[in-house]
Amino acid sequence: ELHVPHVLLCGEQPGPTVLITAGIHNAEYVGIQAAIELSNELDVSTLRGNVVLVPLVNRSGFENRTMSRVFEDGKNLNRVFPGDREGSEAERLAHMLFEVFIRNADAYIDLHCGDGYETLIPYCYYLGDTPAEETAKRMVECVNVKYVVRSHCRTGGAYNLASLHGVPSVLIERGQLSLFSREEIEADKA
């Protein structure tokens, strides 16, 4: 049985459910740390709706220090969505994340950063040509990045699968080389 640690914050006022994931790629520490801190800092008394945080999706990869891969099968989790309930470990994890968390969200933010071998600048993806595109574009406008990519990649990733199923989604890339700074973490939290 798969177990993914998560935090559910229920606001005192009704509203949408926002899902925030990090650690799909397990050595992308900026998003992981930002999600952990958000889970401790968000004030439910001022929150409208719910926030679900999954700070470390790929726990086995994290614990076993595999870069961008699920430890048990060596697969890149963000290339196997929608996954398969009867498949390999990565495929089962992708299937569970989609069915349990993503399908039940009204909006989705997937936090990433450059893994141990990646140098990059902060940017944001959203999927074009979907019913969720307009809302995703409004979400992107709230992200403090200089570059935005309107993607057309429709396979493999969590944010694009969510968008194809009507859940407005963005993927934020911030940080590089599996390193992080306080400034990057604060920017992800904003």
Residue ranges of predicted features:
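Structured catalytic-domain cores with a bias toward divalent-metal coordination
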Residues: 1-190
